[in-house]
Amino acid sequence: GCALSPKDVRETTLEAMATASRVATFVGKGEISVSPEVAYIIQEKCDRCEICIKVCPVAAVEKSPEAITINPISCVGCGICVPRCPREAIDLKNSTEAQLMAQIRGVSEGGKPPKIIAFLEKEIAYGSADLAGQSRVSYPSNVRIIGVPSTGRVSLKHLLQAFAYGADGVVLLEDHGGVFKEETLREHVTQMKKELREYGVEPLRLMSFSTTLPEYGKVTETFETFNSRISKMGPLSEENRAKIREKLQSN
């Protein structure tokens, strides 16, 4: 309702009724369903630095005298906390770091250049790209999509994995109204562009934007524009890819 943003009476009433309905279901059954894809802390690695508490957008990370834990009911599984843990003490159930790294490598390998890896927030952003296909609006076939809970889940390590095994450009596409806000996304990408320079990767090989579900035209147009840019830049050199792979393996 109006606690979220200015709204008219009709919209406020509808949102209030929807909220009341969800609460009534919970109270009536005395139970609630929890997504299997929620974050958890690997306690033997955790040094209780509390960075996860600061970055969680829904305050799902809880501190007690014994340990730091993640409330599975509050957690929305966005994955923002995972790459920000300096000790790699956080992971996502059923969507682990190892699974994501393997998926990135598999999608990046093979095919003809230029290859573009697009990390899409898996609900709205992915749905928008899917809607483009249903509407018979095409985008370049060399754009390969990987669904993620939010683009905040994607770190420099994931970008390097993509570039090391065949990607020539990377796109991050976020839900405009999601938990990973547009301003935070811009800051995140700006920082990663600076870090990519240190690995010999031009910052222009990375771009980001946000979308809403109906804006599939914007999604396809941006893919086209980015594809043209990467085509002009040409593929990343094999020598550079080899150096990145070596650094990844040494970490």
What are these regions (language model features)?
Residues 1-8, 36-39, 66-68:
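Short beta-alpha connecting loops at secondary-structure transitions
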Residues 47, 51-76, 80-99:
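Iron-sulfur cluster-binding cysteine motifs and their immediate structural context
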Residues 25-45, 98-106, 244:
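Long, charged amphipathic helices and adjacent flexible linkers at domain junctions
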